[in-house]
Amino acid sequence: MNRIAVLNVVGLSDRHIGPHTPRLFALRQRWHHASIDPAIPAVTCTAQSDYLTGRRPSEHGIVANGWYDRSLSEVQFWKQSNHLVQAPKIWDELKARDPRFTCAKMFWWYNMYSGADWSVTPRPMYPADGRKFFDVYTWPYDLRPALKKALGDFPFATFWGPAAGVKSPQGAPDAATRWIAGSAKWIEKKHSPTLNLVYLPHLDYNLQRLGPQHPAVADDLRRIDAIVGDLLDFFAARGVQPILLSEYGITPVSRPVHLNRIFRERGWVTIKEELGLELPDIGNSKAFAVADHQVAHIVVNDPSIEDKVREVVLETPGVAEVYGPADKRILGLDHSRSGNLIAVAQEDSWFTYYHWLDDAKAPDFARCVDIHRKPGYDPVELFLDPAIPSAKLKILGRLLQKKLGFRMLMDVIPLDASLVKGSHGARPSSPLDWPIILSEQRLPADTLRSTEVYGVLKSAVLG
């Protein structure tokens, strides 16, 4: 078997390879290249599951980054157990062929209990007193102290939130990505896995925060180019063949679409008041949209209104398509976790999870970075609220409260969805905005389906 390192450069598309990315540009000239017709939806968990199983969501079950669990009547996002992926993974097949095969998963998702030999993934600790401590989960457990001794603590605050992709007291703009790259090199030196899956998220932040056309993105491109170049040199020196790919491309957006507010105004969303704030009671709602970037899985608990829901969503500005049962079968999205209907935004639009009509009644978690409690993806977590005078001083005050043992809310996130300037999830109209794959080995076509990446990776290992 050949030894392979898969460098997952999140958000990279052909549109970004140029003067600001000399290493990637040279690679694009020398290596074989293909565009990837993006996963549906083109989001992290679905794309990775397509790549690592060779199956579509109808088989592997990862219909988005999160979904409505009908048995619990709860929306659950960003879960970590690999048992959620309901199809064999590439390491299962390759290990069955040769027991000597080993795999490291460095920050790819569904990274707990996966069967990979070494895993590292972000995982805070939550003591019973309500506090939160940034940390990572590793398998084996002894990997965690060894990595932290070699690299220091993982700069979690720079992995997601207002400090991600910007210079801050928490670290350099690319601190999280550099730490992950360092962990991939450490794993290679210590264990030499056959397949090393490396997640490099740096571009993801400002492409969403500022938009892919913003001039400041040039600095992000230079930073990721340097990180990738260093990894290419490192792996080449050790006889490891790199493959570079991305999960999706990010396109400019200017219109947030608030489906749950529309549903609420029609009486379809049931609201529960708690301590003067409003929470959605999804199990008692007639319809609710589970928003994930440019895709929304629409749960319809009252079958008698499904046609009306579809009509209302299709008439909503910013909505491109609404898929029903027949469409889901064709697209490989016919799975029990999918919504009864699936809405796809126009390329310049994206879906919020917002259900409140008055910001004063928004739930407390809305103004926090809280990826698990929110019933949908929230890119506004990348911003500090511009309405808060001296927001950074407020953060310092909150951190002091935490250090003194007081409970506190890090409520510094705005509720203005118009701040977001880039998104993904829909299929971009231009292939220049599609994900890509670069390899020293010949690729089977100039354009690959997302499920065909599996075969490329398997062939690279098997030779």
For each of these PLM feature ranges, what is it?
Residues 11-14, 41-42, 57-58, 108-113, ...:
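Short, solvent-exposed loop/turn segments at secondary-structure junctions
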Residues 15-59, 102-104:
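Short, structured active-site-proximal loop/turn typified by the sulfatase FGly-forming signature C/S-X-P-X-R
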Residues 19, 42-43, 65-88, 92, ...:
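Secreted, luminal/periplasmic, and some membrane-associated catalytic domains
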Residues 2-14, 27, 51, 94, ...:
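Beta-strand elements within well-structured catalytic alpha/beta cores of enzymes
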Residues 419-437:
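Short glycine/proline-rich, acidic loop/turn segments that cap or connect secondary-structure elements
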Residues 5-9, 29-35, 43-49, 66-79, ...:
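Glycine-/proline-rich flexible loop or hinge segments
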Residues 55-211, 223, 285-290, 294-301, ...:
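His/Asp/Glu-rich, glycine-adjacent segments
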Residues 213-221:
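Glycine-rich tight-turn/loop motif centered on a GG-T
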